[in-house]
Swiss-Prot record:
SUPFAM superfamilies: RNA-binding domain, RBD. Gene3D superfamilies: 3.30.70.330. This is Eukaryotic translation initiation factor 3 subunit G. Component of the eukaryotic translation initiation factor 3 (eIF-3) complex. It comes from the Eukaryota. Disulfide bonds: none annotated. The gene is eIF3-S4. Keywords: Cytoplasm, Initiation factor, Protein biosynthesis, RNA-binding. Residues 192-270 form the RRM domain. One of its GO terms (cellular component) is eukaryotic 48S preinitiation complex.
């Protein structure tokens, strides 16, 4: 009886058979690291070994997060192990979200309502009629000085010229007054105010206070400063409580050397009443 010949496959067939089987993935956990090894074919139909190393960290999370990790997976991931599957899950950076309820959205003011609260123009500033500064005329620091006096004299002359041209009778009590305004009374501060000039550009209010506090109580002190730099303009006004103290300050400080400069101290000239 003839013996059947043993079949021997060629090496090419063996290669094709080997390509159809891939080693199973392996997972090793040691020294706080999880090493996952997988095999697959690339685009050139070559077997590729992929090794992923994960660092295991233990964190304290809330109960809701811990409970969510125990949920059973479903669909194509029903047979996956606990935790993210690298084949289907990509771990990226944390994204923080802020949820706004409909109630908060309804309470948010519209842009149209805010437009009415905005100033009409960012270039609009206050302009003083006395010194042309960026403040209200009512709060002008020069309203009792020579600048205000010159402004008042010019306004009075303009009013007199207007009255002379109209040929109307003007009561003596109203003669020389600015139309629409009453004549301001003489302030008690005017007779106790002194003007200190030729000050250093680096002088501050504390320096002026040190100069005059030895002569008597001071009611008000003003140091003129540059708007852009904040440096002293070279002069200041001091209002004493008593005129006798102001006179002593003028006598002592006028011609006095201070900060390598000679001070000029005189009475502050209030506006004259017409």
């Amino acid at each position: 009886m003839p013996v059947a010949e043993e079949f021997q496959a060629s090496w090419a067939d063996e290669v094709e058979i080997d390509q159809g089987v891939l080693p199973p993935p392996s997972e090793v956990v040691e020294n706080g690291l999880k090493i996952v090894t997988e095999y697959k074919y690339d685009n050139d139909n070559k077997k590729v070994k992929i090794v992923r190393t994960y660092k295991i960290e233990k964190r304290v999370v809330s109960k809701s997060i811990a409970k969510r990790k125990t949920w059973s997976k479903f669909g194509d991931s029903a047979s996956d192990k606990p935790g993210p599957n690298p084949a289907t899950t990509n771990v990226a950076e944390d994204v923080f979200m802020q949820f706004i309820t409909s109630k908060e959205e309804s309470q948010r003011p519209d842009d149209g309502e805010l437009d009415g609260l905005k100033p009409p123009s960012s270039n609009v500033i206050f302009k003083c009629r006395t010194c042309q500064g960026d403040h209200l005329t009512l709060y002008c620091p020069f309203k009792h000085t020579q600048i205000a006096q010159a402004k008042t004299a010019e306004a009075a002359k303009a009013a007199e010229a207007k009255v002379a041209a109209s040929n109307k009778y003007i009561p003596p009590s109203s003669a020389g007054r600015i139309p629409g305004r009453d004549q301001p009374p003489v302030s008690r501060e005017d007779v106790t105010a002194i003007r200190i000039s030729n000050l250093s550009n680096f002088a501050v209010e504390a320096d002026i206070d040190d100069l005059v506090k030895g002569f008597g109580p001071v009611h008000k002190l003003y140091l003129a400063k540059e708007k852009s730099t904040g440096h002293c303009k070279g002069f200041a006004y001091v209002h004493f409580k008593f005129r006798a103290d102001a006179a002593k300050a003028i006598q002592s400080l006028n011609g006095h050397g201070y900060d390598h400069l000679i001070l000029n101290v005189e009475w502050s000239k209030p506006p004259q009443n017409n």
